[in-house]
């Protein structure tokens, strides 16, 4: 059995955005699919995931299915493959309303048009009758957001929701999510690898590495004072505005193979601060400042940054 996630824990609060960041393959999307109950049947999940006090992992598949779309929803990376090409945009938004709010066909379609207006699709009544291939990438993603928020879910998971969009549309989509979050009080889990997006839109941050949580903090605290060497490396590798002709910083080494992960801290083979004890056991997630947690034996890192061990 291949272990993808190992002892992760986080909390998303109503009306706030929790960003989960990390390199590709670190387990960000797997964690979200586990919450939604969308992992393959042969996946084994242990622990608990609670929504408004209810244990999602203890529910039957039928009970979890009833919650999806009604009380928890997810926006995927690529709207063109997530939307059904055989149905119009309005029909796909209306489907959620008919299923979960028991509206008749006409009432659901009218509500769908109103929802498309809410996500700022111009001429929503006409666009509601168009098929996904007739819409731009930005409009398709807005339709996905309309579907996800149609029933005012308590939790919205946005998995790299702007990856396929240009920078201008990306900013519009993220601003829209912020506005709708404040309006509805929905808790948002934003999965991304873009630290600029995290800085602008997240309230809290979880940094993941190789299936484990490396650091967890308020967004402002994490950017001001990172307390895990991996986070330090991520922030150092982010290109600064106006950089020209300079070599980009990088984190030496490669992500470990989860089929045979290194003992102890999984970042130790790449860490400039690693000591022998780092390979002896998985470091616990420890509070190094109020509300700021790090899974590093050498945290807090005061006085160490910029100096290898």
Label the predicted regions.
Residues 1-226, 236, 300-309:
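ABC transporter nucleotide-binding domains
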Residues 122-126, 216-309:
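Short catalytic/signature loops enriched in Gly
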């Amino acid at each position: 059995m291949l272990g993808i996630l190992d002892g992760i824990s986080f909390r998303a609060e109503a009306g706030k955005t929790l960003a989960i960041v990390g390199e590709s393959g670190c387990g960000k999307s797997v964690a979200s699919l586990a919450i939604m109950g969308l992992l393959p049947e042969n996946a084994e999940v242990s622990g608990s995931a609670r929504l408004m006090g209810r244990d999602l992992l203890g529910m039957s598949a039928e009970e979890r299915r009833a919650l999806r779309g009604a009380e928890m929803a997810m926006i995927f990376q690529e709207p063109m493959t997530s939307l059904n090409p055989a149905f119009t945009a309005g029909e796909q938004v209306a489907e959620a309303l008919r299923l979960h709010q028991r509206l008749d066909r006409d009432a659901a379609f009218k509500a769908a048009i109103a929802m498309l207006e809410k996500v700022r699709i111009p001429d929503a009544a006409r666009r509601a009758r168009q098929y996904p291939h007739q819409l731009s990438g930005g409009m398709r993603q807005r339709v996905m957001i309309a579907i996800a928020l149609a029933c005012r879910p308590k939790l919205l998971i946005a998995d790299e929701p702007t990856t396929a969009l240009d920078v201008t549309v990306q900013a519009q989509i993220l601003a829209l999510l912020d506005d709708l979050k404040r309006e509805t009080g929905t808790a948002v889990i934003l999965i991304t690898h873009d630290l600029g997006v995290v800085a602008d839109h997240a309230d809290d941050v979880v940094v993941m590495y190789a299936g484990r949580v490396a650091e967890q903090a308020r967004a402002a605290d994490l950017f001001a004072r990172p307390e895990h060497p991996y986070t330090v490396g991520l922030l150092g590798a982010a290109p600064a505005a106006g950089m020209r002709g300079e070599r980009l910083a990088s984190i030496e080494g490669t992500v470990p193979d989860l089929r045979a992960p290194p003992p102890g801290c999984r970042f130790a083979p790449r860490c400039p601060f690693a000591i022998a004890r780092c390979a002896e056991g998985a470091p616990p997630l420890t509070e190094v400042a109020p509300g700021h947690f790090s899974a590093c034996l050498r945290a807090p890192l005061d006085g160490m940054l910029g100096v290898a061990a």
